[in-house]
Structure formats: structure tokens, C-alpha cells
Amino acid sequence: MENQSALAQNIIEIYKKHARAWTELRGDFLYEKEWLDLFLSLIPVHSTLLDLGCGPGKPIADYLIQQGHTLIGVDSSDVMIAMAQKNFPKQTWVQADMRTVELDQKFNAILAWDSFFHLIPDDQRQMFAQFAQFSVTNTALMFTSGPMAGEAMGDLFGDALYHASLSQDEYRVLLKQYGFNVVKMVANDVECTGHTVWLAQKQ
């Protein structure tokens, strides 16, 4: 049996393999809307947003664009990026790993929804420096995690799908270390399909 570390390395290939099927499965229902509205309430109108793990751009990026914002989306899957480019050709789409992507600009908001939690714990810790690098004062940051420290396996069309989380206390320490204040955090949000969501703002 493959160990979890090896499975974590398969995430990029799994999403490439199942990009179109995942898009159909995800659908257009925006169960995240309440969180996205709170996220957007923290930033100016017509802001530039960074979406890490953007997928095909639907439905989340679509909603952000509809609210008048400009988007740069990053995804490791070339298929996902091609779909996003086709869906929203006026936005900027970058095929890259969120852990190593290099962008010479900063953003009013950073989103890592259903993407950050596929990273192994050490990579998650290192991402907070990346979040800070792309931030300015008052940048909003929102990401999803697990409700507690640990690793878990899901399933995507028969392939094992790796997830990991740090503890809530460690996330709070890292956010504070990199200059973010927690605005709201809900574990296993029943109004958002059980997601554990963090919303913070750069000071």
C-alpha cells in the first residue's frame, strides 16, 4: 500500500487526470457564497485577487469576477488552466505549483479554497511565507483546512486523494507570525458542506 507521503505527491496528476470529470461533479452551485461575500467585504471594489488552486474558474472565480474584481488564477493542472482560460479569457491564468509560483505583484485578496489542504503539513507551514509575500496591508486571506491536525484520505473517481491539516492552534500561531489577524474561523461549517474555513486579514 502506498504511504500517505507518496499519495500526496500524486495530487497534481490526479487533478490533471480527472479535470473534466471533477468539473462536472463540482457543478455551479455556490455553497461558499456566504464566505465569499464576507471575504470580499474586507477589500476595496475592483481589487486584484489571487486564486491558488483555481481549477477551471467555475463557480468560484466566476463569482469573484462577477463582483467586479480582477483575477489571477494559479493551478498545477494544465487541463484546468486551459479550461479557465477558455471560460474567462480576459483574466490571467498561470499553470504553476502554488508552493513555488513566482508573481511580481501583490494582491488585495488571496484565496486557497479546497486546494491548500492537499499539501503535506510542512508545505502548509511554508505557505504562510508565500501568503505574506503576496500581501499588502489589509489583504484578505481565506483558505480551507481540516478541523484538527492529521492526514486523511478521500477518493476521486477511484484514486486516493490526500488531505492534511495542522491544528487550529498552529494555524493561529502561523497567521500571527506572518502578520495576519483571524477575522472568522468555523470548523465543520454545516452551512458550507462541512468545510473548515479560515478568514484572516494582513495587518
PLM regions and their residue ranges:
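Class I SAM-dependent methyltransferase SAM/SAH-binding core
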Residues: L50, P56-T100
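Helix-to-beta-strand junctions that scaffold the AdoMet/dcAdoMet cofactor pocket
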Residues: P44, I120-P121, S135-T137
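Core SAM-dependent methyltransferase catalytic element
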Residues: A187-Q203
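Conserved beta-strand signature within the Rossmann-like core of class I S-adenosyl-L-methionine
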Residues: N138-S145
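A short glycine-rich, Lys/Arg-flanked "PGG" loop and its adjoining helix->strand segment in the class I
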Residues: R125-T137
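Conserved class I S-adenosyl-L-methionine
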Residues: E2-P44
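A conserved beta-strand element that flanks and buttresses the S-adenosyl-L-methionine
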Residues: L111-A112
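Acceptor-substrate binding/catalytic loop of class I
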Residues: M153-E170
